Regions:
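Rossmann-like dinucleotide-binding domain for NAD(H)/NADP(H)
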Residues: 99, 221, 230-328
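N-terminal glycine-/charge-rich "phosphate-binding" loop or analogous flexible N-terminal tail
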Residues: 1-58, 325-328
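Oxidoreductase and adenylate-handling cofactor-binding alpha/beta cores
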Residues: 111-130, 148, 164-171, 300-313
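Phosphate/diphosphate ligand-binding glycine-rich loop within oxidoreductases
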Residues: 49-129, 142-143, 148
């Protein structure tokens, strides 16, 4: 029997027209939705209700227990990317839905973007570009990275790559891992420290943890207050790691010098969101990993994960398939 495979959220188009599209279509009856709407529960269920396999392209489609309950034939969610915060993993385990992802594929691209945001916000590049185009000639002092302290919250694939890219700038590295360090900090030239020490001593704090029940809102008002008023925050991980109102207040009141943000609580950022009015923030639309190299490699990996699952040899497993159940 040919499995029904649905891509509910290929907007903006990533899979369509890529090198991964033909291999995916060879695996079953494939339906690709190239328009918005997957962020709405009823529409998501309409799209994937009869699916055996879902390939999740965008994190705004949320696979809750209620959604899974409406998809009785679903056997696999293959995620393009590493984040799983849009998937109820416990519900997947309970309902026998396997989950895979593509670890490490976007690590270099997101690490590059992290460094770019550090430079953009510390050097005030967007503001100076805007002022120069307007006929001004801004001459204010800038920050340089050499001699600064960079604190990394998380040393997964992206955090480690950021450390490697940052070292040639002459930056001192601190790191806090979510769990035992096991020598990971030393391996990238960083000093492992408690989070309180990292926040107090860092000139730049960069977030690289996954979003979970434990890390939701981790940088709250009390922890943000530990940072220097001259410090910068960079977030290319997940918006939910930071208490939004506390961050806005700190930036607005000068208790933080600035921030570079690629991720937000609500995506796309709604009109009127106070972060849009902050002059000391550099914003990008959660596209730090959106390079052609990442798209091609990540989508091919996600499709390969579907193929391996269908032949009973799953890889990159986040939630394992139930024993004894046929893949499709």
């Amino acid at each position: 029997m040919t499995p029904k495979i649905v891509v509910p959220d290929d907007y903006p188009p990533a899979l369509t027209g890529s090198a991964a599209e033909a291999p995916l279509r060879a695996l079953g009856d494939v339906q690709v939705h190239g328009e918005r709407g997957a962020e709405q529960e009823a529409e998501l269920v309409r799209r994937i209700g009869a699916a055996v396999v879902v390939v999740n392209i965008r994190a705004y489609a949320r696979f809750t227990d209620r959604v899974l309950a409406a998809c009785p034939g679903l056997r696999l969610i293959s995620i393009w990317g590493t984040g799983t915060d849009n998937v109820d993993l416990d519900a997947c385990r309970a309902r026998g839905v396997a989950v895979t992802n593509t670890p490490g594929v976007n690590a270099h691209a997101v690490a590059e973007h992290t460094i770019a945001l550090m430079l953009a916000v510390t050097r005030r590049i967007p503001a100076m570009d805007r002022d120069t185009r307007a006929g001004q000639w801004p001459r204010g002092l800038l920050e340089q990275l050499e001699g600064k302290t960079l604190g990394l919250l998380g040393l997964g694939a992206i955090g480690r790559r950021v450390a490697e890219l940052a070292r040639p700038f002459g930056i001192r590295l601190l790191a806090t891992t979510h769990g035992p360090d096991n020598g990971r900090a030393a391996a990238v030239g960083a000093r492992a420290v408690p989070v309180e020490t990292l926040l107090r001593e860092s000139d730049i704090v960069s977030l690289h943890w996954r979003l979970s029940a434990e890390t939701q809102g981790y940088l709250n008002r009390a922890r943000l207050a530990l940072m220097k008023p001259t410090a910068f925050l960079v977030n290319t991980a997940r918006g939910g790691l930071v208490d939004r109102s506390a961050l806005i207040e700190a930036l607005r009141e000068g208790r933080l010098a600035g921030a570079g943000l690629d991720v937000f609580h609500d995506e796309p950022v709604p009109a009127g969101d106070p972060v849009l009015a902050l002059p000391n923030v550099v914003l990008t639309p959660h596209n730090g990993g959106m390079t052609r190299e990442v798209i091609d490699a990540g989508l091919l990996r996600a499709v390969e994960n579907v193929e391996r699952f269908l032949r009973g040899a799953p890889r990159d497993v986040v939630v394992a398939p139930p024993r004894g159940r046929a893949p499709a």
